[in-house]
Amino acid sequence: MRFIPPQRGFNYMSNERLVAAANQFKRLLLDNKLLVVAVVCTTVYLGILDNVLESETMKLDEAAYWLIVENLRQPWLTPIMESFSNLATPVTIVVLWVLVTAFAPGRRVGLCMGVNLILALALNQAMKAIVQRPRPEGFRLAEASGFSFPSGHSMVAMAFFGLLVWFVWRYEKDRVRRALIIVALCVIIAMIGISRIYLGVHFASDVIGGFCLSLVWLVFFTRIIAPLLTADKDIESTPNSTQ
């Protein structure tokens, strides 16, 4: 029997199909970015939760303690970290919510922010009651009560400032201003989480778990609830909201 090599046209079509499939998969990911974020965050959160429930000491927590508590703490830095931490306290969040309600375009943005915050807090308290992880001991620079996982400050920061990011992305027309505001809000979110580790009231896994759970909640909220609450003609949509 004589060997017949495959035709070039077959290879060409196979490669063409692979490229087409790759492009289709890429478009699918781009069209469902929030879903991808939710899946990744859910995976990370469940992985951390499994370790917490098993009462295992995570290398993540040990590394964060070494880096932030043992090597980063300085007398001049502590007041700065306390200030960032205070941005997610009830009084500060209420003041910020009032300001957003007063100055945001449309009449329903404040309602949306309030509903989001209340539900995120309820989710946080429910998870804390289920997991009941004790807070770290022996190196606190601030008073804190209640359970540790997931971090309430981290969840509030991501829920409140993260929803602000969503609003800015949808309704701010100036691209430079939009980018600057979003970067500033993301820095605030990150610094609030870091400050909780620095002050010794949370493990790093508490903070990352709080961020992940809150991001999953935000994906659900912005896809299902927020569009219903913000269906206000007074809010003018930008091209970003139609893409």
Residue map of PLM features:
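Short helix-capping/hinge motifs at transmembrane helix termini and TM-loop junctions
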Residues: 53-55, 104, 131-132, 173, ...
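Aromatic-anchored segments of alpha-helical transmembrane domains
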Residues: 44-47, 119-126, 187-196
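Interfacial segments of alpha-helical transmembrane regions
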Residues: 32, 36-40, 97-120
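N-terminal transmembrane-helix/juxtamembrane module of multi-pass inner/ER membrane proteins
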Residues: 2-90, 129-131, 135-141
